[in-house]
């Protein structure tokens, strides 16, 4: 049985949908924190069990009978994130999974300027020593994050953010389809995958130009000093660790950490990945 964690989240839910295009429902199980949100999956024949990355006993039940486990990384920074990933990896191995698959990041590195990428690197190190075959999906930066950063500008026309660099913004839907393809073809990749990215890298200046072309309204890209951006986030009530995490996106982008483009994603899904311009057009429609 293939177990998918976080199956009511954006990436996990879409991965299950695409996986059901490839394998029978009785071969798919999900581990979720709230079973009620997964009732539509249960109705389709998917096994639904409660599992939490902070509760190894719940994971033992959720992962029972697993041949593969897809561990969708948590939306946290730092040691807490790494510890939760460790708990999930150890539970998957203990359950007898033949392979552990993990949603990592294209820029995973202990030297990254972005905390989440350092966390992914630490998790990959745990995977390397876990005693089971593993695959680390080196996912491109989620396109949804670009749209969130751009959100306030859609009304004001002012893209006021710290200086950035080119990023291979990549759609959840494409990454979910790739994950499903890899799970259905067990062992296709061993260890870290090549970067799973869109076909072009864009800056927020590029996004401002795209938004202007789509809407016919002017959009101005203004570089906000880092300390000013930090202060704005703090004044908005963003926790200090989150402030530094968000700032890390820009400092890492300036260093070119997210600029890589690779054909692997297109090969996996059998078509060109969704371009961020299409996502932006949908957002502005």
Q: How should these model regions be labeled?
A:
Residues 1-36, 54-57, 64, 75-83, ...:
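Oxidoreductase cofactor-interface core, primarily capturing Rossmann-like NAD(P)-dependent enzymes
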Residues 5, 72, 270:
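Residues lining the SAM
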Residues 37-44, 61:
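Short loop/helix-cap segments at secondary-structure boundaries that form the rim of catalytic
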Residues 42-55:
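Rossmann-fold cofactor-recognition segment
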Residues 63-67, 284-285:
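Compositionally biased, low-complexity linear motifs
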Residues 215, 227-285:
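A hydrophobic C-terminal alpha-helical subdomain
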């Amino acid at each position: 049985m293939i177990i998918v964690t976080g199956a009511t989240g954006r990436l996990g839910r879409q991965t299950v949908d695409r996986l059901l295009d490839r394998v029978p429902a009785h071969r798919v199980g999900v581990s979720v924190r709230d079973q009620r949100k997964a009732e539509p999956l249960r109705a389709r024949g998917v096994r639904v069990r409660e599992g939490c990355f902070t509760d190894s006993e719940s994971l033992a039940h959720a992962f029972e009978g697993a041949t593969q486990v897809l561990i969708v990384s948590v939306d946290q920074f730092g040691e807490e994130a790494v510890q939760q990933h460790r708990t999930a990896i150890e539970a998957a191995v203990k359950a007898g999974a033949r392979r552990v698959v993990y949603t990592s990041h294209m820029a995973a590195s202990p030297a990254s300027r972005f905390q989440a990428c350092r966390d992914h690197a630490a998790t990959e190190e745990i995977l390397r020593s876990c005693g089971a075959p593993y695959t680390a999906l080196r996912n491109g930066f989620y396109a949804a994050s670009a749209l969130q950063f751009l959100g306030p500008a859609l009304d004001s026309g002012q893209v006021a953010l710290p200086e950035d660099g080119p990023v291979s913004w990549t759609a959840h839907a494409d990454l979910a389809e790739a994950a499903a393809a890899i799970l259905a073809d067990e062992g296709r990749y061993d260890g870290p995958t090549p970067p799973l990215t869109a076909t072009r890298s864009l800056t927020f200046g590029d996004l401002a130009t795209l938004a202007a072309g789509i809407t016919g309204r002017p959009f101005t890209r203004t570089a906000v000093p880092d300390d000013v951006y930090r202060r704005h986030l703090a004044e908005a009530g963003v926790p200090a660790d989150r402030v530094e995490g968000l700032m890390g996106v820009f400092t890492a982008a300036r260093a070119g950490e997210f600029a890589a483009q690779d054909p692997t994603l297109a090969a996996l899904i059998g078509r060109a990945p969704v371009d961020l311009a299409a996502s932006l057009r949908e957002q502005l429609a």
